[in-house]
Amino acid sequence: MWDQKWVIGNWKMNGRLQNNNALMHRFRIHPTAERVLIGLAAPTVYLLQLHNAMQIVLNNRILTCAQDVSRFPNNGAYTGEVSAEMLADTGTDIVLIGHSERSLYFGEKNEIQRRKMENVLNVGLIPLLCVGESLEEREAGKEHEVIAHQLSILQGLDTKNIAVAYEPVWAIGTGKVATVEQIADMHAFIYKEILSLCGSDVKIRVLYGGSVKADNAADIFAVPYVDGALVGGASLSYDSFTAIISAAQNA
């Protein structure tokens, strides 16, 4: 896992039961990509469906990922919340933390994201922390400062396995893609920060998550310190998503 390329598809608020089943069955014919860890982050209501399909149809070749988790650690009067323990019950393996849309629409900041990270780790799941700067922050030359602040929640966590997705907010859903030089700079910076915060013996995966498509995936995977991709809209298409997986396998 920690020496593979990761390709995680984030469905966001998309999916229906019938369409999900059809997609899972199409994956039956896709050849095994031994060098790639594949995951799908579905809406919570579909996690158990995906997990069961992955066991029955795909022999666990694709991991179940959740898009979010509650900041509250235990059961209680938190209407609408889903705890880390509940996600574990669905067979979830990986949990996204701090996606830019959670910050944009729900105002989530470091304190909440830290609590979510701890909850996920406490039940044995893998958190995937999302970090990234806005266009205004990049144009002001503050991208390193912003990312360092977001990564600071990693300090003191009881884990030696750190997964981060760098998602420049200005390149999500806009059709814009950071240059190879920009991606290389930010991923190298993130690696350096993680090692400083967590120690030299930590295992690291840093994914790129800014409008990854079938036609740019190979170039992105060739960038130093890019360990995979967090894929948005392209993960809803079997052909596009499997093309990205193939690019990772061949990187």
From Swiss-Prot:
Signal peptide: none annotated. PROSITE patterns: TIM_1 (PS00171), TIM_2 (PS51440). InterPro entries: Aldolase_TIM, Aspartic_peptidase_AS, TIM_sf, TrioseP_Isoase_bac/euk, Triosephosphate_isomerase, Triosephosphate_isomerase_AS. GO terms for biological process: gluconeogenesis; glyceraldehyde-3-phosphate biosynthetic process; glycerol catabolic process; glycolytic process; proteolysis. Keywords: Cytoplasm, Gluconeogenesis, Glycolysis, Isomerase. Its EC number is 5.3.1.1. It catalyses: D-glyceraldehyde 3-phosphate = dihydroxyacetone phosphate. Gene3D superfamilies: Aldolase class I. It is an enzyme of class 5 (isomerase). The keyword Transferase does not apply. SUPFAM superfamilies: Triosephosphate isomerase (TIM). NCBIfam families: tim (TIGR00419). Homodimer. Belongs to the triosephosphate isomerase family. Involved in the gluconeogenesis. Catalyzes stereospecifically the conversion of dihydroxyacetone phosphate (DHAP) to D-glyceraldehyde-3-phosphate (G3P). This is Triosephosphate isomerase. It comes from Neisseria meningitidis serogroup B (strain ATCC BAA-335 / MC58). The gene is tpiA.
